[in-house]
């Protein structure tokens, strides 16, 4: 999974934007290896 500060989804390749637990993910059913997650604030310990 690629983690970047801004995610870009390409619907023509089957990408879908999903928000889970306050984070933005790009998932793809056609190409399951094509995943992205938007980097949020660092985790508190």
Curated annotation (Swiss-Prot):
One GO process term, biological-process aspect: translation
Start and end residues of each stretch annotated as Disordered: 1-45
Alphabetical list of InterPro entries matching this protein: Ribosomal_bL36, Ribosomal_bL36_sp
MF (Gene Ontology): structural constituent of ribosome
A matching Pfam family: Ribosomal_L36
The entry's keywords: Ribonucleoprotein, Ribosomal protein
HAMAP family reported in the protein's UniProt record: Ribosomal_bL36
Protein name: Large ribosomal subunit protein bL36
């Amino acid at each position: 999974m690629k983690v970047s500060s801004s995610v870009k989804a390409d619907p023509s390749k089957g990408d879908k934007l999903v928000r889970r637990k306050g984070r933005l993910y790009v998932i793809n059913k056609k190409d399951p290896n094509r995943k992205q997650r938007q980097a949020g604030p660092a985790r508190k310990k």
